[in-house]
Amino acid sequence: MAMAMRSTFAARVGAKPAVRGARPASRMSCMAYKVTLKTPSGDKTIECPADTYILDAAEEAGLDLPYSCRAGACSSCAGKVAAGTVDQSDQSFLDDAQMGNGFVLTCVAYPTSDCTIQTHQEEALY
């Protein structure tokens, strides 16, 4: 006697695709912070939700900041925090000493307070 197998697959109704830079629900917050970016062409203050990477918020605000991997695995988007705090636990490039000196990778950094970041700091890392 032959046995028949049947598999069914269904997509969740109303499921939204993952958004790059969106924090998991356990880390989400409704807060938004003022992030001042000190660029070679001048200072620009943007509003950055706590669940959005600083680089993504800057691009949405029309700024053109350097980046390459968008994964925290290189130094193209390096900046230096002059004031405030960020969460960059998604990065894998900077060592403890570099982070202790204020360096941040804007492509994987979330603001955790109002902050000021000097952008275009890749060369200062070395």
Curated annotation (Swiss-Prot):
Keyword field contains Electron transport: yes
Keywords: 2Fe-2S, Chloroplast, Electron transport, Iron, Iron-sulfur, Metal-binding, Plastid, Transit peptide, Transport
Entry-linked InterPro entries: 2Fe-2S_ferredoxin-like_sf, 2Fe-2S_ferredoxin-type, 2Fe2S_fd_BS, Beta-grasp_dom_sf, Fd_pln, Ferredoxin_transit_pept
CDD domains listed in its UniProt record: fer2 (cd00207)
Transit sequence range: 1-32
Residue intervals of the 2Fe-2S ferredoxin-type domain: 33-123
GO cellular component: a single term: chloroplast
UniProt-listed SUPFAM superfamilies: 2Fe-2S ferredoxin-like
Subcellular location: Plastid, Chloroplast
UniProt GO molecular function: 2 iron, 2 sulfur cluster binding; electron transfer activity; iron-sulfur cluster binding; metal ion binding
Names of required cofactors: [2Fe-2S] cluster
Binding-site list for [2Fe-2S] cluster: C69, C74, C77, C107
Classification via Pfam families: 2Fe-2S_Ferredox, Fer2
Top-level taxonomic group: Eukaryota
Keyword set includes Disulfide bond: no
Alphabetical GO biological process terms: electron transport chain
Cofactor binding annotation: Binds 1 [2Fe-2S] cluster.
Family per record: Belongs to the 2Fe2S plant-type ferredoxin family.
Assembly, per entry: Forms a complex with heterodimeric ferredoxin-thioredoxin reductase (FTR) and thioredoxin.
Function (record text): Ferredoxins are iron-sulfur proteins that transfer electrons in a wide variety of metabolic reactions.
Protein name, entry field: Ferredoxin, chloroplastic
Organism: Chlamydomonas reinhardtii (Chlamydomonas smithii)
